[in-house]
Structure formats: C-alpha cells, structure tokens
C-alpha cells in the first residue's frame, strides 16, 4: 500500500494496482457503498476498501479520474496516494495511518459534555433528584423548555458531522451509521420542539394539566445524550483503531532519515533519499543501517530483531549482507548500498503487511453482505416499530422512543470492523517476529492446514552438508576426492557444497572439467584430461559403470550402513570404472525435532520430502520425528507429491525457495522459510524471514488465534444486534417488562465497536515461546 501505482507482471500494459485515500467513511455500510460504486466502473477488475485505514486498493485499467468520480458520486471523497521515495520518508501511507480522529473527537466530546451537564441539570435534576432550580425557572415552564432547546441545538452544532454525513448518505441512497444517529437524534429533537410549542399553547390557554403532560414529552436531553454518547464511543473506537496499526507505524519509523555518505574518503551526512545503489556509506556503533547493502570493510555485531524478531546479534564481516533499520552494535562498518528506497527489505515488509491489511479474508464476506443492507433494514424496523406501537394505542412519545432506540442501538460498525482489525493486529504481530502473511486469505487459511510437507534440505536440516566418510574402491582416497571435487565444482546441488568445502579445506586444486552436464535429481557427468567422469546416486551410476559382483556387494553393503546413519552416499566413476563412494550428511537444525513435535501436538500430519534413498530418508525422518517420509522425490516431482497429499486434506508446503516454486504454488498454503532479505518470493503465501522451523507452528498458531478472534468479534457484532434491536423495539415489554431508553441504546452502540477493537488488540498478547499454547 505504499506505492501509488504498481504495474502487475504478466498483465496488459495499462493494467495497474493503485492505492487511494478515501474520506467521509464512518461505518461498514460506507465502505461497502464505495466498493460497490468503484467495482461498477468499466476497467476495474478488483476493488477492496479498508475502513480501518480509510484506504482503497483498485486493480484494473480504469484511470484515476474515473475512479475518483465514482467515489464522489457515491457521496465520499478520494485522492490517489503518493509513493514515498524512501522507506523512512513520509508518505501518504503514514497519513492514512495517522490517528487524526481521536484529537477531533476529544474536542467534540469536551464541548458536548460541557453543554450536556447544564442541560441534564435543568431537564432532569429537579424532577429526579429534587435539585433546586434558579428562581427564574420557578413556574416558568416555557423558559425551561427554551433553555433545553438552546443547549440541545448547541450540542447538535458541535456534532454536526453526524447530520452532514448521515443525511448526505440518505440523499445518495446510501444510508450509514451516521444516518441512524442523525435520524434518532433529529426525531427526538423535532418531537421535543413540537411538545414545546404545544406546551406554550397550553400555558397561554391556562391548561395546567396539558402543560405538565407536554413537559414530560420533552426529549431534548435524549437527543443531546445520544450525540454525546455516540461521540464517546467513536473516540474510544478511533483510539483503539489507532493502536491496531501500531506495528505497521513502528516499522515505518525504523529507518533513519539520514545516512553517512562516503565519497572519495570524505564522510558527509545526507538525507537518505540521496543515497543510491553503489554508494558507500558508514555506520558507527549504536547507529541504524540506513539501506540494504553489504559490508566492504569492518567487523561488527548487528541486531536484526527489528526485521526478524531474532534478538541475538549477528556477526557481520566483509562480504556479508546488511539490511535497513537493523542496529549496528559494536564496530565501524563501511558498506556498499545494493537496495535503496522502496526496494529495501524494510520497505518490502511494510508493503506486505500493508497490502495484507488491504485485502479481505473470505470470512469477511458474510459481514460485508450484511453491512450493505443493514442500515436500510434498521430504518425499516424503526418505522414498523413506531407504527405498531401507535396501532396498539401507545402515545406518540412512547412509540417514538421505541423507534429512536432501534435506530441508535443498531451498529453496523462492529460488523465492519470485526475482521479487518483482527487481520491488521495479527499481521503486525507476525511481522514483528519475522512471520509475513502476504494476504488476509493466507492469514486466515494457514491455521486450517491438516498436513505440513517439509522439504528436508534447508528446512529440516541446515542445508550445510559435510563429508563424513570416504570409501575408495580400486584407487587412492586422494584420487577419488580430486575427481569428486573437480566434478562437483560446477554443480549447484546442495550436497555438492559438502565436497567443495572439503576440497577447499584440504587445499585441493581446481581441475577444469569440460562438457559438464547435470542430470536433474540423479547425477553429473563431465570430461577431465580426456577421461569421462560420472557422479551421483546408485540408480544413475550403476548404469554408467562395469563392476565385479563382489565389489558391488561390498559397496552396496557399506552404502546401506551410511544410509542407516542418515548419511547420503554419493558414487563416482571414471571411464565406466567405479572410483568409490563419499558419504555426506546434512546437519539437522536444533529446533527441528521440537517444532515437528509441536506440529504433531496440534493435530497436524507431518511429511518429509527428500531426494535421498529410502533408507537414508527413513533414518533422518526418525531423528526429526516426522509422521511420514516420502523418499526419492526429484525437484520436478514435488508438485505431484503435493497434489497426491491434497487428496487427504489441506496441505502446507514448507521450503526454502530453491526448486520449490511449483510445489509452493500447488499447495493450499506455500510457506517459504529462511527468506532473509529475499522476501519477494512470488510462489509463497507466507514468508518466514528466519530459518527457524519453529516459526512454522508459530505461524499456524497465530493464524488460528487470529481466526478465533475474528469469530469472537463477529459473534459479538451479530449477537449484539440480534439481542439489542428487539429489546430496543420493546419486543419483550409484555413478557418481561423489559424496554430500553434511547440514551441507554446510544450508550450500548457507543461501546459495541470499542469492544470489537479492544478484543482484536488482545492478539498483541500472543506468545511465540516454545511451550506456549494457542492463546491470544
């Protein structure tokens, strides 16, 4: 949501996703109206409106002017967001998240309360508590009525926004929450004015009994109290809504505003916008790193917790990458900028969290449908309530009070906020710990997975294999390893790293290999000094060599021993003659067994995918504690395995992004682990910045906690209206004698949205500890 215009890859030239600020929305009915109006514009393929951030995301080919006109025709105002040049720079996104509502609400509330106190004293103090009135009012009922009228008018002027927005919505045939408040308070006021005129006429005619009758028909204090209480609720709601975006606002504040540019050996402090790719910049101890780059000179420990949630500092040496907003703790670093502005890791995280908040979870669709028709239905119920009570013989004042109660107790805001506030808070909590959900859908659906498929290398293991055993056959160990080192030099397979690392450590010299060819998932071949080298697993190598039965038996027997220990045997041959075998083992991550155990405790079936042979795979799977091992899976075969697993339930595929894209895309939920600074992994729905496997169950628990919170919010929003509206209408009067004064209805309405937002804020208490249960 930071950029104002993004051309989508694979789309036609004029196809864009653009962000807009929307002004004038007060409830879910408003956002539904805007969404409907913009979606009807030719060229718009998708439109999502966020009531929480007062923003709108539009996808398609329609031009901005047409979209803005559609919003204005619906009765609201819109403007295109401007892209910020730097992650740390001010943008319209900052403005969209800035809490401008609370200060205004506070001023309105103070003015309303100051005016309400004398109004309540005059209208109810003498009658209810026998408080003394000024002598001027003794026997002067018209004066009492006029004073109440003046105070009420003043309070209505202070809260004129309800009337302006409410009646504007009515004119545009798009009634909203403000319409309900405006109609309720206006009806109370108009009827009270009528009662005041009628009482004045009775005073002139000397009809004392009618004077007292009409005195009791004054609802000035109800109109004023409704407006004041709704303002209290809106202020509490605005303040709480501001807190839901704290995590996102915190991310925006992380990047420094300046950087120390080093040019020709001279240091100069410049605005961060003046730093470009390739520039050198200096970072002293205690300073935040301004942009992404790598260390040219110096050594230090850098705290990356702002991005990853990992509190342990990471050592940085020449050549190591550094990220914007991380804290240099100990040494002086001279770095070269590689990514600046909106390309930094920090900006990408802000984009991701912000964009996720702009999307809608499937569960929100029910609330959106109800919100779209909620206000017209409530107005209809209020009219029917008034008519029914009049028909059964109740006085106008009583009938009107019931109708007003229906109007002011109904709350579409609670319905509209139930899902987005929970999504925003849940996403923010995840981002602070290096868990990034790309969309609201991914945050909702991750918790529903039943099967988790884990790619072995880089996910369960560290992806840092090492040579454990060397078994030469018919040649010296040095000859075998030199051949293996020469062949693996050109391989990109993770296991090749082990042999290359061994060769480097043992001062092996690089031998040129020509005609190199990699056979996907099986082996390698190449030519060295006129001789053909082959390397790979037994299935591949056995078809390339001639070997005596005794030698094969001995070799296979030793390979089985290695495999039973969780090691992967690699075979090498030259000109069709076996040279021997090298056993390689990857190191398991410290938290893998515990994370897998936690997944199993959550009722999730855990599957390990690996290209290793069955025996090696089973040994590693047993160490890790997985439920099922699928061995011999080639990189291009993972997608088919995922498709097969999906027949048994919802599948999450967890991989490090290397050769995993098709499988991540095929799975119901693709989770990329260990993304580090490369978080723009298109195939993944969830991005885990660290290589901690424990973040997988944490992401699932957070998703479940968020979904549970949404259910609680929706339950409260629906049950509040289901119980409140009949109570306000007087449906239980004849059975239990229960009824509801309009003032209490307004108080209930003012608290409903506040309760929903406050409940969502409980997600900030979510624990990521190893032993924590699914609590929020």
What is the predicted function of each stretch?
Residues 199-203, 209, 224-285, 316, ...:
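Juxtamembrane coupling segments of multi-pass membrane pumps/enzymes
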Residues 32, 45, 449, 528-530, ...:
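Conserved ATP-binding TGD loop and adjacent catalytic N/P-domain core of P-type ATPases
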Residues 104-258, 369, 470, 737-740, ...:
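Transmembrane helix-loop-helix hairpins at the membrane interface
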Residues 307, 366, 401, 414-487, ...:
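Conserved catalytic phosphorylation-site environment of P-type ATPases
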Residues 128-142, 171, 190, 429, ...:
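Membrane-embedded alpha-helical bundles of multi-pass transporters
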Residues 1-143, 155, 168, 266-267, ...:
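Flexible metal-binding regulatory segments at protein termini and peripheral loops
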Residues 42-59, 69, 217-218, 249-343, ...:
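Conserved cytosolic catalytic loops of P-type ATPases
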Residues 105-107, 326, 447-492, 522-607, ...:
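ATP-driven catalytic headpiece of P-type ATPases
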